C-alpha cells in the first residue's frame, strides 16, 4: 500500500529517522472508519425497494475498509515480532478464521431478529469498539510491547 508507506515514511522522518511498528497503523484509522460506513450503508440499503447497486457500493466500501485495516495490522504484527513474525501472523490469521467460522452460526438469527439495518448497526458498533484499539496501540504500543517477557530483536 503506497499510501501507508507514505504515512510510515513521514512518521519515521518526524521521529528522527527511527521507525516504530506503531507507525504502520494510521492507515487503519481510515480503514476502520470506511469499514463501519460500508457496513452501515449495506445494512440500511439492503431492501427490495432500493436499487441493488446501492448495497453493492456499501459492500465495496466495506471491503476496501477491511483491506485498509487488515494490511496495516499485519505489517504492525510483522514489525513488532521480528523473527517470530510468521508465528504471530499465523496466530492473527487463525483468530480471523475462527471469527469467520463462528459468525455464520449466529448471523441468520441476528438478521432475522434485528433485520439487516439494525443487525449491521450492531456489527458496526462492535467494529467501533474493536477500532478503539488502534489509537490505543498507536499511543501506547511501545509500552505494551515492552511488557512482554522476551525481546525478539535479541534472537
Curated annotation (Swiss-Prot):
Which cysteines are cross-linked by disulfides? none
Location in the cell:
Membrane
Give the record's membrane topology. Answer: Multi-pass membrane protein
Q: What SUPFAM superfamilies does this protein map onto?
A: MFS general substrate transporter
Q: What is its main location?
A: membrane
Q: Which UniProt keywords apply?
A: Membrane, Transmembrane, Transmembrane helix, Transport
Is Cytoplasm included in the keywords of this UniProt record? no
GO cellular component assignments: membrane
Q: Where are the transmembrane segments?
A: 25-45, 50-70, 91-111, 118-138
Q: Does the keyword Ligase apply?
A: no
Q: Which family does it belong to?
A: Belongs to the major facilitator superfamily. CAR1 family.
Protein name listed in UniProt: Putative uncharacterized transporter C977.04
Amino acid at each position: 500500500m503506497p499510501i501507508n508507506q507514505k504515512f510510515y515514511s513521514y512518521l519515521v522522518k518526524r521521529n528522527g529517522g527511527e521507525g516504530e511498528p506503531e507507525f504502520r497503523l494510521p492507515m487503519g484509522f481510515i480503514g476502520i472508519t470506511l469499514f463501519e460506513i460500508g457496513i452501515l450503508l449495506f445494512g440500511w440499503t439492503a431492501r427490495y425497494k432500493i436499487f441493488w447497486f446501492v448495497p453493492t457500493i456499501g459492500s465495496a466500501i466495506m471491503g476496501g475498509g477491511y483491506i485498509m485495516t487488515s494490511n496495516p495490522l499485519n505489517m504492525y504484527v510483522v514489525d513488532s515480532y521480528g523473527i517470530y513474525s510468521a508465528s504471530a501472523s499465523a496466530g492473527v490469521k487463525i483468530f480471523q478464521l475462527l471469527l469467520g467460522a463462528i459468525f455464520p452460526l449466529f448471523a441468520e438469527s441476528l438478521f432475522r431478529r434485528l433485520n439487516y439495518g439494525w443487525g449491521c448497526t450492531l456489527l458496526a458498533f462492535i467494529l467501533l469498539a474493536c477500532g478503539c484499539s488502534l489509537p490505543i496501540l498507536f499511543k501506547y504500543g511501545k509500552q505494551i510491547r515492552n511488557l512482554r517477557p522476551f525481546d525478539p530483536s535479541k534472537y
